[in-house]
């Protein structure tokens, strides 16, 4: 028996990293929003790794922040260590990574939700999304409360019909001992949504007091802290070290002797796990030539002795896990506080979604995060942000925010999921982005804050700070272009001291910086009138000047890319009427329903020849609009 419990514009189902960003975006855009969590103690919980960012993931966090999301600000307030990764490589792959105090991270995010206007946080399990005539009408809780809503966003994480697996033990359950959500999947299936099943896992947690750090390599945080959020300032604080050790022959021996007890290798686990975050036993079996593997020992917070054993995710039995741990240098006496486990869960085929993250066939139903087949807090957060924005924009009668592959890593991620689908938990990587020199983490605000302001999520204080930074960068670049460096003896002597050839004729300082051995910082002595600019402005000026030629080439590639993206395909276009398209192409195009030729060209099973046919036919179609039954 159900009862009417209230009415909201948007319901967000789940309050993990996707749900938090979705709910905040929706509410901040002025629509009444309710977010449901099965347990309010689990809001923004970090059930796996205790960090935010990393390679490519740091880019996503910067982009979330640039659009007006919360993740970057939240980690800046709660980090216990911060490092910029890949600094020996080019700026395109520099990625910020911060170790989080897991409890403080979750507590602060929950408080932000609780104190946001238009946002209501409730503890309840949603068992049904009420859909009538392919349109969302409401949601029903396990306790019988019915909420009338105009849009709903699925952010269920790994909780749908989740099953914990440890050796030959398996039981229904969610991460960190929380209950699974067993009833919602069936409701979605009954609404025509295709459900699949994925697997992920997490390592053991061990007691800090039982670790011998003297046998490990200490990894300290950076001395100069770079914040995730463009709004954060002066966030330096005392940091806590992480440690690196390695597995060895004994660890390998333990795994091989017990591989028949691994659910991955004895047939107990049939679902697909993440390729780029394999379990430890999977590493041993897939890379038999490797004698050792990195193991990272990471603190989970300031006020806990729990340490995360990074790189040692496992579904082996508890007794084997303990032997495995104690074979690692520094962990000979390790006490396991939490067991590693694998978890299987229901998720959707993301090709059922539009690029707005709304279901193609269900008006008002959106989906974000691990529900869409992705993995990771950052991948979840950025999808939640886009789904929340687009749910609000839809209800306001506005066009959705669609980020292109040339706009953001978020655009790459969503396009990959929606256009290609995924056969395994999808992880963001820099190699997935064709235009990664343009999509750097340092220029996320320059790429996206204007968009965030236009839709109303970026408020005036942030926008004012953004325009000030943008102007400072542009003015400094213009100034450098107007400074002429002459071929005086003292100038050439200075350059030779930097192993750079002397000048034969005058050159602008902007052009001089382009030399491989020089940069904006080392030529300071040639620039007597240089003002003291913020470090982030100086970094941006240096990157733009040094890489201008490469950046220009990528911009030209983007222009070519846009030509295909601008060739729109009408929603009503019938591929079955097109002569010359292969059967596989017709089936794939009909399923994905690409919005333009660019997206069509990225669909697996659609060849360049199919695209050529499609381009010719679309021109004819546009000339003869209205003749839908005509064959082409």
Swiss-Prot record:
The keyword Flavoprotein applies. SUPFAM superfamilies: FAD/NAD(P)-binding domain. Keywords: Cytoplasm, FAD, Flavoprotein, NAD, tRNA processing. SMART domains: GIDA_assoc_3. GO terms for biological process: tRNA methylation; tRNA wobble uridine modification. FAD binds at residues 14-19. NAD(+) binds at residues 273-287. It comes from the Bacteria. It is found in: Cytoplasm. GO terms for cellular component: cytosol. NAD-binding protein involved in the addition of a carboxymethylaminomethyl (cmnm) group at the wobble position (U34) of certain tRNAs, forming tRNA-cmnm(5)s(2)U34. Homodimer. Heterotetramer of two MnmE and two MnmG subunits. Belongs to the MnmG family. This is tRNA uridine 5-carboxymethylaminomethyl modification enzyme MnmG. The gene is mnmG.
């Amino acid at each position: 028996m159900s009862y009417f419990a209230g009415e909201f514009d948007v319901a967000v189902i789940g309050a993990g990293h996707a749900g938090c960003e979705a709910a905040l975006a929706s509410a901040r855009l002025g629509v009444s929003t309710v977010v449901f969590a099965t347990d309010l103690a689990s809001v923004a919980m970090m059930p796996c790794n205790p960090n935010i960012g990393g390679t490519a993931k740091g880019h996503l966090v910067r982009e979330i922040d640039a659009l007006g999301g919360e993740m970057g600000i939240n980690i800046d307030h709660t980090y216990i260590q911060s490092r910029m990764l890949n600094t020996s490589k080019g700026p395109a792959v520099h990625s910020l990574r911060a170790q989080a105090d897991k409890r403080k991270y979750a507590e602060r995010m929950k408080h932000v939700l609780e104190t946001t206007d238009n946002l209501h946080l409730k503890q309840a399990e949603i068992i049904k999304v009420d859909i009538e005539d392919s349109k969302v009408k409401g949601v029903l809780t396990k306790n019988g409360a019915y909420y009338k809503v105009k849009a709903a966003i699925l952010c269920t994480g790994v909780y749908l019909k989740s099953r914990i697996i440890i050796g030959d033990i398996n039981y229904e359950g969610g991460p960190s001992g929380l209950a699974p959500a067993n009833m919602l999947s069936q409701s979605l299936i009954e609404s025509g949504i295709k459900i699949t099943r994925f697997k992920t896992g997490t390592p053991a947690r061990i007691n800090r007091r039982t670790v011998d750090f003297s046998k490990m390599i200490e990894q300290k945080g950076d001395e100069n802290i770079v914040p995730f959020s463009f709004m954060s300032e002066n966030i330096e604080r005392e940091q806590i070290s992480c440690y690196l050790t390695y597995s060895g022959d004994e660890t390998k021996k333990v795994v091989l002797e017990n591989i028949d007890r691994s659910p991955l290798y004895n047939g107990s686990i049939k679902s697909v796990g993440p390729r780029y975050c394999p379990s430890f036993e999977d590493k041993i079996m897939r890379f038999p030539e490797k004698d050792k593997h990195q193991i990272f020992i990471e603190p989970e917070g300031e006020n806990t002795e729990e340490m995360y054993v990074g790189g040692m995710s496992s579904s082996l039995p508890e007794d084997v896990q303990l032997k495995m741990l104690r074979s690692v240098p520094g962990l000979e006496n390790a006490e396991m506080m939490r067991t590693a486990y694998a978890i299987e869960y229901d998720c959707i085929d993301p090709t059922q979604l539009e690029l707005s993250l709304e279901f193609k066939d269900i008006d008002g139903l959106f989906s974000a995060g691990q529900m869409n087949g992705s993995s990771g807090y950052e991948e979840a957060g950025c999808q939640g942000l886009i789904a929340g924005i687009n749910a609000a924009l839809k209800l306001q009668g506005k066009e959705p925010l669609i980020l292109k592959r040339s706009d953001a890593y978020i655009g790459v991620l969503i396009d990959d999921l929606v256009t290609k689908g995924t056969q395994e938990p999808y992880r963001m990587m820099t190699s997935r982005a064709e235009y990664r020199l343009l999509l750097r983490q340092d220029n996320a605000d320059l790429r996206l804050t204007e968009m965030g302001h236009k839709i109303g999520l970026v408020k005036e204080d942030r926008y004012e700070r953004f325009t000030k930074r943008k102007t400072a960068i542009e003015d400094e670049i213009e100034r450098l272009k107007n400074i002429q460096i002459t071929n005086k003896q003292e100038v050439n002597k200075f350059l030779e001291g930097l192993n750079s050839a002397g000048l034969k004729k005058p050159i602008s300082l902007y052009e001089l910086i382009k030399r491989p051995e020089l940069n904006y910082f080392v030529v300071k002595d040639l620039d007597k009138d240089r003002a003291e600019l913020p470090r982030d402005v100086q970094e941006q000026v240096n990157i733009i000047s040094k890489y201008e030629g490469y950046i220009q080439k990528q911009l030209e590639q983007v222009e070519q890319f846009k030509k295909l993206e601008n060739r729109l395909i009408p929603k009503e276009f019938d591929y079955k009427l097109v002569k010359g398209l292969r059967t596989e192409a017709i089936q794939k195009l009909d399923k994905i329903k690409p919005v333009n030729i660019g997206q069509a060209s990225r669909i697996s099973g659609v060849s360049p020849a199919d695209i050529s046919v499609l381009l010719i036919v679309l021109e004819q179609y546009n000339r003869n609009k209205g003749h839908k039954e005509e064959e082409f």
